[in-house]
Amino acid sequence: MRVAVIGGGPGGLTTLKHLLEAHKFVGGDPVEAKLFEAEEGIGGTFLKRMYEDAELVSSKYLTAFSDFRAREDDPDYLPAARYLEYLGEYATAFDLWPYIQLSTTVTAVRRKGRSHVISYATQDGKEGSWLCDAVAVCSGLHVTPNIPSIKGIDKVPKSFHSSGFKSREQFGSDTTVVVLGTGETAMDIAHLAVTAPTKRVVICHRDGFSVVAKRTPSPVVFPSLASQLQSPNPPVPVDTYLHASHKWGNLPGNVFDSLVKQGMWLMTGTSAGYDQWVGGYPSPRWHTSNVIFTKSSKAMPYISKPYRKDTILQRLRSSIVQVPIPETHGRHIDIAPWPSHIDSEGVLHFIDNGRPEYKRMEEAEVVRPDVLVFGTGYTQRFDFLDSTYPSTSDLDVRDVWRRDEPSVGFIGFVRPGFGAIPPLAELQAQLWVLNLLAPERLQPLLPQDEPHYRLGMPSDARIKYGVSHDDYANQLAVDMNASPSFMDAVRIGSSRKEWWRLPLVWLLAAEFNTKFRLCGPWKWDGAVDVMSGELWDVVKRRGGLLKQIVLSGVPLVVFGSLHLVLWIFTSLFKPSRW
């Protein structure tokens, strides 16, 4: 079988790797695979869109591929440049380079009988074609900038999309900077702007957002005794233990939603987000299973500063427990509704959203931006595919392929509400390759097993491909018979001296991809070492018994009890598949 991979980002690299290694795991003849990458190097968006102080928003423990881990001395959150280096090391470790064609743009994909013809052009002007049996589209979510139309934008001296942002120097000095959007990149840019020699920084949102901390907050209990009570352990990446809701109805998700909101209120005084006193989602939409969190919180102290409440209740709460609030050195970021237009004088006008920020901006000095940055995300285009091919909106099998076109897979086109795309792309690649080569080894891929992992996005949302990371990852593993049970973890770990480590990591940690290499068609001998070593150390970092109970014990007891009841119910009444 010959397979073309389009795109050399994380999704393309892991797809190429699994194609080349498939015969070792599922048998059969080796696959002939070739990866086409338009740029001069691999890495996708991490190659083209690095900017000052950029780092991953997901930890190295979650983001790293299952069988190629980040270095022990790497920080928890890799700088973008280091992650790019990691991808190069991955390609070297699995000998992918001979199968990668750099500086080669795929110009068209067309059908020839049951096969596909890849037409391509190199940067030096050469053209060619390659006949193959299957195509993996891995061109990435973050390629074509999404730039909304704003009347009067030509009145702003300098405007550009965040894809063109590199450093603070682009803001200039004594300038008014406006950032449109509240995603991670927009928040990073707003923080860089407010810590640069600018005059004023404004950030605009459409209909709310929710910021969460990447690292577990370290609240001070009874601040007057802080020096005695603060934990000596470094903060733990949140995505190494976050528990998602599961497929058995809404009750577990509602309990989790309540725990998250109450926890944020207890530590920061607000349940809208991490130290987020303004700009939250409207109540009907604000549920943890319905949103994509913003995992960049450095700008939040500057945004919340004018809105932070000083009531008797807040004073009482903060005297008992409080996350330290970073110093803003007298600066703040104005938050505003989405702009309606820019007038002939270059003044920005805002849509009246009925929120406190609109009233405050109406009473404040007019906003006349010198620099406007569109932190408004990206759209997906597949101009190289002709009209007979599916697009991402047509995918009806695990958001990877269309049921009547299994030879064309789309890898990496989901967005986790809290998590990382690369590990999900790895699981997608495993599922798609297995379906190509040994479909009999899969469980039935039923449509009714999909709604539970989808985020409940509103119909007018720009992003319609949101998923719950843990639920989606586990579903793909279940499809491949690669999701070990707790008793599997006990059995597999029983041969080791520290036999308890593996089952405890199974219980207390997130859905790391390495967990799904303990068994199944992609079983890897090194999985036990990673789970019982590196990932055990992460779980152990949480500190004492109290923190373990709060971070893992409470969710385990709550969700475990709910699932025990459901298990008894299904055992007694044996309903059909949910």
From Swiss-Prot:
Pathway: Secondary metabolite biosynthesis; flavonoid biosynthesis. The keyword ATP-binding does not apply. Keywords: FAD, Flavonoid biosynthesis, Flavoprotein, Membrane, Monooxygenase, NADP, Oxidoreductase, Transmembrane, Transmembrane helix. GO terms for cellular component: membrane. The chain crosses the membrane at residues 549-569. Its EC number is 1.-.-.-. It is a single-pass membrane protein. Disruption phenotype: Impairs the chlorination of flavonoid at position C3'. Pfam families: FMO-like. GO terms for biological process: flavonoid biosynthetic process. Its cofactor is FAD. One of its GO terms (molecular function) is NADP binding. It is found in: Membrane. InterPro entries: FAD/NAD-bd_sf, Flavin_mOase, Flavin_mOase-like, FMO-like. It comes from the Eukaryota. The keyword Transcription regulation does not apply. Belongs to the FMO family. This is Monooxygenase cfoE. It comes from Aspergillus candidus. The gene is cfoE.
